[in-house]
C-alpha cells in the first residue's frame, strides 16, 4: 500500500459555498460530458521542450473558469503565463524563460469548461520536460485542520530542496499542488532526492510564507520512491509512496 503524509494546519478555517443552479425552467437534459482533448501542440509529454506557446484543441467550444485559482504550474513561475480560450482552442504563452533539464506540470484543475453548460474537464494535466527525461516520482498525503481534524480543501502543498528556514520566505517551492475537496494531495513529477514538505494557506498567492498565513511542515525529510509490491497475472503494479522512515507528523508555525 502507499504510505501517506498527514499534515495538520493550525487554526485554519476555510469557507466554501455552493449555489443551486438547477432551479427554474429546464430546456432539456443537461450536457454532463466535459470537453475532450483532440490535439496538443507540442504533444503532452514532450522532451527537450523549447516552445514558447502551447495549444490544446478540443471537440467543442470552451471557456475558462477562474484560472488564477484553478490552474497550477509546477515549478511555479514568477511571471504568470497568458492562458486564453478562443473557440475550441486553449493557448498557454509563457512569460519567462523555462529552466533547463526540468519537468514542468500544468494542472488545469476545473478551469476548462464547455461553453454552454460549464461542465469542467477534471484531472487534465499537461506535462513536459526541458531535458531528456520527465521525472515521475510522487508524494501523496492529506491535510487536516488541527482544531477539529477535518480535512482541508484548497490548501497549497509544496516541497523545498533548500533546508534553510529562510527558504520559506525567499524561495518559491520546487513543486506544488493543492488539496482536493477531501483534503488529499499528490505532488507529481518529482525527481529523486530529499525534500522538506509544507502545507500553506497561500493567501498572497506568491508561493512564499507571509506573516499571518497558516503553515505546517514535516518534522523530517521526505524522499519519494516507487515500490513494486503487488503482482497481478505476472505483471507488477507500481505503488507510489514515501520513505518508510519518514514520520507522518507535522508541526505548525505561527
Q: Could you say what each language-model-derived stretch is?
A:
Residues 218-219, 233-235:
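Post-kinase regulatory C-tail/linker adjacent to protein kinase catalytic domains
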Residues 230-231, 238:
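Long, low-complexity intrinsically disordered regulatory regions
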Residues 6-17:
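Bacterial N-terminal signal peptides
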Residues 202-211:
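Acidic, glycine-anchored loop motifs typical of Ca2+
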Residues 1-5:
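Positively charged n-region of N-terminal signal peptides that target proteins for export
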Residues 18-182, 186-189, 194-198, 212-218, ...:
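Acidic, low-complexity Ser/Thr/Gly/Pro-rich repeat segments typical of extracellular/periplasmic
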Residues 12, 199-201:
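Residue-level marker of motif borders
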Amino acid at each position: 500500500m502507499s504510505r501517506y503524509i498527514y499534515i495538520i494546519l493550525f487554526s485554519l478555517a476555510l469557507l466554501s459555498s455552493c449555489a443551486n443552479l438547477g432551479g427554474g425552467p429546464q430546456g432539456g437534459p443537461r450536457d454532463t460530458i466535459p470537453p475532450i482533448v483532440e490535439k496538443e501542440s507540442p504533444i503532452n509529454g514532450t522532451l527537450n521542450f523549447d516552445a514558447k506557446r502551447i495549444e490544446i484543441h478540443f471537440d467543442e467550444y470552451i471557456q475558462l473558469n477562474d484560472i488564477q485559482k484553478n490552474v497550477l504550474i509546477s515549478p511555479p513561475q514568477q511571471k504568470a503565463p497568458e492562458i486564453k480560450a478562443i473557440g475550441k482552442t486553449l493557448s498557454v504563452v509563457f512569460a519567462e524563460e523555462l529552466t533547463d533539464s526540468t519537468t514542468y506540470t500544468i494542472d488545469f484543475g476545473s478551469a476548462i469548461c464547455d461553453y454552454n453548460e460549464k461542465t469542467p474537464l477534471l484531472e487534465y494535466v499537461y506535462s513536459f520536460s526541458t531535458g531528456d527525461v520527465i521525472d515521475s516520482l510522487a508524494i501523496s498525503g492529506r491535510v487536516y485542520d488541527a482544531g477539529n481534524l477535518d480535512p482541508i480543501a484548497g490548501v497549497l502543498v509544496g516541497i523545498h530542496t533548500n533546508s534553510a528556514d529562510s527558504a520559506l520566505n525567499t524561495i518559491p517551492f520546487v513543486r506544488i499542488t493543492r488539496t482536493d475537496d477531501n483534503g488529499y494531495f499528490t505532488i507529481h513529477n518529482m525527481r529523486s532526492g530529499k525534500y522538506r514538505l509544507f502545507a500553506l494557506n497561500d493567501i498572497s498567492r506568491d508561493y512564499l510564507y507571509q506573516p499571518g498565513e497558516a503553515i505546517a511542515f514535516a518534522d523530517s525529510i521526505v524522499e519519494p520512491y516507487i515500490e513494486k509490491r503487488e503482482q497481478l497475472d505476472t505483471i507488477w503494479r507500481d505503488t507510489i509512496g514515501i520513505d518508510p522512515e519518514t514520520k507522518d507528523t507535522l508541526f505548525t508555525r505561527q
